[in-house]
């Protein structure tokens, strides 16, 4: 394939990626903010672009996180779009499209495989599990941090092919910037080690680098580990700041709330659930409540499945190194949010898969090619399978995105999937009260308290509504109940 021919093919793929992403997500330009952190994020970001705003972004620990770059991007949006949600949604979409294109180009630069890289990028663009990160304005940190994750990987590829201090400094700087968008990037040094194994083949593993890719100089494992020390220092610093922020806002659950065993079982159940939803993406929700109890049989089965798959993939590492990289990418990048250190009261979240699923997509794309490589009509079979699965993804993702139209559509969908979701009742109640329907709002607050009598925000919101209705004695009773719960 000539360079010109390859260039035009890449342009064509980029065009298809942009077109398909726009076809799926342009609907978000007409979406409202949702009553799930959006109003608070936008309210806090309603500042002029000034040195004091920049200082605030770098000093605040609001929402139990330190992510100044995310705050600055939202402040910029506020100065461009004011309170119009359309602009914020389009910004998220632009970041997602950019990430999709960069992921394709970065994977192609690493592997030399044009169509497999394109399939991974298309899965990244169109998978229903990624809807939450794109359609939810508050998840700006996902799409923004992923941009720097991919740029860091690409800079790392350049560094490994022609090492130098300036190139390493670029890797370091991009990683540092990415951590200011979302601390979940702390696992990136681990993923760079996986890339050293495959596809960069910097470790002796029997993997033959494609002829169109410049071969890497083989390095010892101690050297590769030492090479990551400056990046690991950034990981440690970010982890410490994140822990301080989450402790300050009491976001970390105590062992009384969830024992170590309970957390471990939930973590493995979540791994299995993420894998299941990757292939069979039904019952996607904005909130998955943390389970009060987990059966040993169910949790044990999840542990057995994950360990069995890990052993199987490790045994295939020589013949299918992409499986090892993809699988351990998935497992490793989910560690900060898998719940061993439990933050909040959710069991899992679709948004947590934005970067981790790239590993699974790599395994699927290269695995499909591997399975079909000796079969007749390999290329048309692979193309049909890829187009079919992407079509199913697109239809499901389009429907899932529509649930994010506004607060009511989002949380009525959550209640359709889990009628006892007390947070959903409370959030719908707040939105209903803002619309002036006090009686209906009160019903939702009562439903929240019926499903969780210890949920004090519902008492506070019910009290506020009763006060507006002139029922002062009832309002005082609700406020007292909220205070009793918080004592």
Write out the residue ranges for each language-model feature:
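Polytopic membrane enzymes that build or remodel cell-surface glycoconjugates and lipids
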Residues: 1-461, 468
């Amino acid at each position: 394939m000539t360079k010109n021919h390859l260039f035009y093919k890449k342009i064509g793929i980029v065009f298809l990626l942009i077109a398909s992403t726009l076809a799926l997500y342009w609907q978000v330009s007409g979406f409202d903010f949702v009553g799930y952190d959006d109003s608070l994020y936008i309210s806090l970001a309603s500042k002029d672009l000034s040195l004091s705003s920049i200082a605030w972004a770098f000093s605040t620990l609001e929402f139990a996180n330190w992510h100044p770059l995310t705050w600055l991007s939202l402040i910029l949006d506020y100065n461009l779009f004011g309170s119009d949600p359309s602009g914020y949604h389009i910004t998220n979409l632009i970041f997602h499209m950019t990430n999709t294109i960069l992921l394709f180009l970065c994977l192609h630069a690493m592997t030399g495989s044009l169509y497999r890289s394109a399939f991974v990028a298309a899965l990244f663009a169109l998978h229903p599990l990624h809807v939450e990160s794109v359609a939810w304005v508050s998840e700006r940190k996902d799409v923004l941090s992923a941009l720097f994750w991919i740029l860091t990987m690409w800079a790392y590829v350049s560094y490994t092919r022609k090492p130098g201090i300036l190139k390493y400094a670029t890797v370091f700087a991009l990683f540092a910037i990415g951590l200011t968008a979302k601390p979940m990037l702390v696992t990136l040094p681990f993923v760079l080690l996986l890339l050293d194994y495959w596809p960069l083949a910097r470790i002796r593993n029997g993997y033959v680098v494609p002829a169109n890719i410049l071969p890497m100089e083989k390095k010892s494992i101690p050297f590769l580990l030492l090479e990551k020390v400056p990046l690991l220092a950034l990981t440690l610093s970010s982890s410490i700041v994140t822990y301080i922020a989450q402790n300050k806002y009491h976001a970390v659950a105590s062992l009384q709330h969830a024992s170590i065993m309970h957390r471990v079982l939930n973590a493995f159940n979540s791994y299995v659930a993420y894998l299941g939803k990757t292939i069979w993406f039904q019952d996607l929700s904005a909130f998955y409540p943390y389970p009060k109890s987990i059966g040993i049989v169910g949790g044990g089965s999840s542990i057995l499945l994950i360990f069995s798959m890990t052993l199987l993939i490790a045994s295939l590492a020589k013949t299918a190194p992409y499986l090892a990289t993809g699988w351990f990418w998935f497992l490793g990048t989910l560690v900060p949010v898998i719940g061993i250190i439990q933050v909040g009261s959710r069991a899992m979240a679709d948004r947590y898969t934005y970067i981790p699923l790239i590993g699974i997509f790599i395994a699927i794309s290269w695995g499909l090619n591997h399975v079909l490589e000796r079969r007749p009509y390999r290329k048309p079979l692979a193309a049909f399978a890829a187009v079919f699965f992407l079509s199913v993804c697109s239809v499901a993702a389009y429907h899932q995105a529509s649930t994010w139209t506004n607060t009511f559509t989002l949380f009525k969908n959550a209640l359709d999937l889990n009628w006892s979701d007390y947070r959903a009742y409370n959030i719908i109640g707040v939105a209903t009260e803002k619309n002036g329907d006090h009686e209906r709002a009160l019903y939702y607050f009562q439903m929240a308290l019926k499903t969780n009598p210890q949920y004090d925000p519902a008492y506070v919101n019910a009290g506020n509504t009763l006060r507006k209705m002139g029922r002062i004695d009832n309002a005082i009773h609700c406020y007292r109940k909220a205070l009793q719960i918080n004592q």
